[in-house]
Design a protein with these regions (language model features):
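A structured, mid-to-C-terminal "fold-capping" secondary-structure block
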Residues: 235-266
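Short non-catalytic regulatory patches outside canonical folded cores
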Residues: 2, 8-9, 123-140, 148-162, ...
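Carbohydrate-binding/catalytic loop surfaces
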Residues: 194-203, 258-270
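Charged, amphipathic alpha-helical oligomerization/scaffolding segments
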Residues: 98, 102-112, 116, 145, ...
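Extreme N-terminal leader/anchor segments
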Residues: 1-98
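N-terminal, Lys/Arg-enriched amphipathic/low-complexity engagement segments
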Residues: 76-140
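Amphipathic, Lys/Arg-enriched alpha-helical patches that create a basic surface
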Residues: 263-291
């Protein structure tokens, strides 16, 4: 063994544990046998036994009994789980109700304004509406998607899923960048964006803006981010953190938003900690997309 390196032993298989248990019981039976003949009889009985068959029968019995127990008790366990869930949701609402009301009010007012604006645009004469048709279509769908994601974030925050809410904000931020880029570079870019929806193209549609070198092999989101009107430098750190939260990164695994800033806690469910970041960022992103 190399100095300073701990060698991790391989975990024992269920079969190995089973055999060790039988051997321990056998040794005890032989030790407690009244006569040597009785001890030999016990040993012979063990040696003639089909241990693999016994193990398979044991495993089958345990599996059936476990399934039967779970089936019998699952409704009781789920009702207990739901009671705990409702207790958490009530505490969460009591603690954060002002923030939730503000977020939901923003959603309601933005939706009403968007509906009124759509009716106004669609009532315009065709010749007045046509020059910005593709920009309107692209922005309408982007805005609709952002509205849904904003509501998803509210729902996740109410349920105590800070990391999930922040992951959804990541998508909202990307929508804010794309919407800013389309508005900035105009109708032809908006049309290419729409047409790309029927292809596998992710960002090549952005070449229509003439903002990228023809020598550039692929356009990335980061490329678009650099040339849009949103101050991406101010948001880069937060966006990078959201990426780590979404992906299987060590930072996103050991630094969960809902774990109270300590490695002593492993988040496996709801937490009332860490939801403010997603709430604030999503409100800003929705305002940017709605502008």
């Amino acid at each position: 063994m190399n100095e300073g390196r701990m060698v991790m032993s391989q975990p024992k298989s269920l079969m190995e544990i089973f055999l060790e248990t039988i051997e321990t019981a056998l040794e005890k039976e032989i030790e407690n046998a009244e006569t040597e003949e009785k001890a030999r009889e016990i040993l012979n009985h063990f040696e003639s036994a089909d241990v693999e068959k016994i193990f398979n029968n044991f495993l089958s019995t345990v599996t059936k009994n476990t399934f039967s127990f779970i089936k019998t008790t699952m409704f009781e366990e789920v009702m207990r789980f739901r009671a705990d869930e409702q207790e958490f949701l009530a505490r969460q609402e009591q603690r954060w109700y002002r923030a939730f009301v503000a977020s939901e009010a923003m959603y309601i007012m933005t939706l009403a304004a968007a509906e009124a604006y759509s009716k106004y645009i669609e009532s315009l004469p065709k010749d007045e509406f046509q020059p910005k048709y593709w920009t309107y279509i692209a922005m309408k769908y982007i805005h609709g998607r952002a509205m849904q994601e904003f509501l998803e974030i509210i729902t996740l925050m109410k349920n105590g899923f800070a990391d999930g809410a922040y992951a959804r904000w990541r998508s909202m931020y990307e929508l804010s960048v794309i919407s800013s880029f389309i508005v900035q570079y105009g109708e032809n870019v908006a049309k290419k964006f729409y047409e790309a929806s029927e292809t596998e193209d992710r960002y090549e549609w952005a070449r229509e803006s003439n903002s990228f070198s023809a020598k550039k092999k692929h356009i990335t989101f980061n490329d678009i981010q650099k040339v849009c009107s949103i101050d991406s430098d101010a948001w880069r750190k937060q966006y990078d953190l959201a990426n780590k939260t979404v992906h299987a990164s060590p930072q996103g695994t050991f630094g969960r938003l809902g774990d109270m800033g300590t490695h002593c806690v492993i988040s496996v469910g709801r937490s009332d900690y860490g939801i403010t970041t997603a709430g604030e960022h999503s409100a800003i992103s929705l305002a940017q997309i709605s502008a």
